Regions:
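Short glycine/proline-centered loop/turn elements that form peptide/ligand docking sites
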Residues: 82, 86, 108-111, 128-133
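Conserved catalytic-core motifs of GNAT/GCN5-like acyltransferases
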Residues: 102-104, 116, 121-138
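Acetyl-CoA-dependent GNAT
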Residues: 5-75, 86-88, 92, 96, ...
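Short coil/turn segments at alpha/beta junctions that flank glycine-rich nucleotide-binding fingerprints
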Residues: 79, 96-99
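Active-site acidic-Proline motif in GNAT/NAT acetyltransferases
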Residues: 73-79, 107-109
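Extreme N-terminal starter segment of soluble prokaryotic enzymes
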Residues: 1-3
Length: 143
């Protein structure tokens, strides 16, 4: 298993992976734009030649890193891979002077516990934030 920067040639495989592992639907161009703006902040987890996880983020004004996506196939969860992805993204953001990391997570997601273990706190609720009407929880971590 290896973690590497997302490459444009992986786009079709990434879209299939996300369709299978997320409830949200995104246009392909979104991921190309994310990669273009900050390639070091867009990572994939590859095992046996297949994408089994990914994360991407964006550097925002006011010294913020916003985690846009962090997802792993179920059988790769709870193995430290998500923490490794988050740590790598945060390290890559340090050259921008990032002082705060923000993200949104589904109100009904087990990932809330994961993020709390990483030092994130819930700071807001976004009613009907997700495409299926589920509320989102805004979480933040000070660096």
């Amino acid at each position: 298993m290896k973690i590497e920067k997302f490459e444009e040639k992986q786009l079709e495989e990434l879209m299939l992976f996300l369709d299978e592992n997320l409830n949200e639907n995104y246009e392909r161009v979104v991921f190309l734009n994310i990669r273009k703006r900050w390639p070091e902040g867009f990572l994939t987890v590859i095992d046996e030649g297949k994408i089994v996880g990914t994360c991407c983020g964006a550097i925002l004004p006011n010294d913020k890193l916003r985690v846009l996506i962090l997802v792993l196939q179920n059988d790769y969860q709870k193995r430290g891979i998500g923490k490794d992805l988050m740590d790598r993204m945060i390290r890559a953001s340090e050259i921008f002077g990032v002082k705060k990391v923000t993200l949104e997570v589904r109100k009904d997601s087990d990932a809330i516990t994961f993020y709390r273990k990483l030092g994130f706190s819930s700071v807001d609720v976004l009613p009907c934030y997700y495409q299926d009407g589920c509320d989102g929880i805004v979480m933040e971590k000070q660096l």
